[in-house]
């Protein structure tokens, strides 16, 4: 089955059905003339559904692997002699054949693997909660010397869990978990940084500080030593790729990219206290890619290579030359926008919402999922129950652990999250926004604005069942006619908020991760946005891990505004039309 199957989608659909029944049981009379929402042509602008994401496999064409050598760096200036070292072992060898494999999360939330002997197939991460969607998946390699590569999962709330390998089809049960990792916006597996033959971890904070976690060889008690700060200023990069051994010295290396597309090589030193040499520029123009990925050595020469993906889903392979630079790219496959997340990808992982809900004038709800290629899939009917016009709606970035948006519904002053009744008195608010985690605990939160313009933070409990007592975090927000957010626009990994003033000026409020003051001072990012009847935050539309925005004008034309990852947005691109049949977009 393709990465687009129905397990997670079925869960979402049942939530909508459940919440519909709940609201009905609360006394809501939804009987309406059938003509109130007569079937209308589906809004256009999206391609038909015969796509790689919904049936059939993405194509993959990687270099043919040669017999493994001691090193492929012979004859390259600055590279190691082939007789001096044995190349680093692959970190993502799922099936034990000595070669790195591909592990990724599909657009349905399921995990999939590709090995040398098997095309894309379901890969089961053994978890107590089958509906939990990890925020990131990391392959550090064989940490205990048993010949099998371990797999790490990182939850949105900051729990890093270690799974022993279960072969090409899945992992074993968790042997260790550690909390507090939500303080980092990127956790990477660069390979062996201290020369002991085991893979280590690199973690970056939103402010750009870098920490190294050295592996201990104990996969049950304490698999990593305490983190040690080894650098700062790494927030200049929007992609940090743990590349394993790029130059043939057996040590882990890093490939890092700036938002402008410049690529830098950090060679490992073998010294855990100072693990990298000074950076060397290795390329430019790489901003055409939305993800840089490492699958270890692709061609069998013992050197770590890079795979790059374009927004349309095309893959390109860059084979290492042994000195931190790469040979000319080679086409590597198509349709890989089907991967919402690659293990080994360089971007900050986006999690929580890649979708929209749209409400028709007759009160039906339609669901639009991000296609991960700058567009949406064709709409799907979420609820044909008429009468949703009597409910105040907002689609919040995930408030539980499944990674899907949660529908906030206020009816007669009572707030429901999906099928869960939260409480009464919510009629005092005229805007609810769920941009993600604003308090720094990794759990989705909600911002509520009252009729006086005061802004309140409701911290989520990570289950979507309860909020902490409200905290006032701002005032004067009645100057805005739209407040939206679904992830990070500024590149620091923290959830941000965008507000549109009544005169059409657009402002960005960067998230701080501090519950007491969750938003920084506003910055203007555009004008003229009052041309849009609807303005919404669907999350990441183009696969780069950064939150994007859309606007629908009075004619029903749909425009995407992709984030640059620097607190600005790109020029608009038209992606659809006919959306004037909707009176609400969330």
Regions found by a protein language model. Name each.
Residues 2-4, 8-586:
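Trp/Gly-enriched beta-strand/coil motifs that build multi-repeat beta-propeller-like domains
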